[in-house]
Design a protein with these regions (language model features):
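Phosphate-binding/switch region of NTP-binding enzymes
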Residues: 64-162
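Cytosolic-facing regulatory segments adjacent to core modules
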Residues: 1-36, 50, 148-150
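Helical hairpin unit composed of two closely spaced alpha helices linked by a short loop
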Residues: 38-78
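Alpha-helix capping and helix-coil boundary motifs
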Residues: 1, 24, 53-59, 126
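Flexible beta-alpha connector loops of hexameric P-loop NTPases
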Residues: 16-18, 49-62, 91-98
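Active-site-proximal loop/turn and secondary-structure-junction residues that shape catalytic pockets
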Residues: 21, 46, 85-87
């Protein structure tokens, strides 16, 4: 704990954590106007979506992703929009965009980079948690590279090591 505190101290004043329970993307935009961040993490991005006025939930999620992208462009910041995978991804190591929860194409269309994280299927009788993870880069407008990186999750430090 003391090492973490020492490492955090120099950046503490530049990191803001906001409770966004019940908030929408308009609130996110107002926070960006007020604080002018370089990086915004939306965990879970889908929870900021307003479903009113949309015929289907996937349309609301697409509109939400579009709003997040516009915030990134207008406020010159990187927006990390966390989302969940659907049940289609359960037990699979190789993942693709169609396995996104709720919006199979709408959210993906707005992303510059998509990294989907998989873990090994459960093994019957295995008591120990499997820490192997598979980072699937399924969309990459930044460098063009697509593929998988197999790594270990160090849960004590929340780091992936390859």
């Amino acid at each position: 704990p003391s090492k973490a505190r020492d490492l955090y101290a120099p950046v503490k004043e530049r990191i803001k954590v906001k409770d966004a329970t019940g908030r929408d993307m308009n609130w996110v935009e107002s926070v960006c106007k007020a604080y002018k961040p370089d990086i915004v993490l939306l965990d879970m991005g889908d929870k900021f979506a307003k479903t009113g006025g949309f015929a289907r939930a996937d349309e609301a999620l697409k509109a939400n992703a579009i709003h997040a992208r516009m915030i990134a462009k207008q406020h010159d910041c990187a927006v990390f929009y966390m989302s969940q995978l659907s049940a289609d991804a359960e037990g699979k190591i190789v993942l693709n965009q169609s396995m996104m929860e709720g919006s199979r194409t709408g959210k993906a269309a707005e992303a510059d980079l998509m990294v989907l994280i998989a873990k090994n299927p459960p093994v019957q009788g295995q008591d120990e948690e499997d820490c192997e993870r598979h980072l699937n880069v399924v969309k990459n407008k930044l460098t063009g590279w697509h593929g998988s990186v197999h790594c270990q999750l160090e849960y004590q430090t929340a780091r992936y090591t390859a």
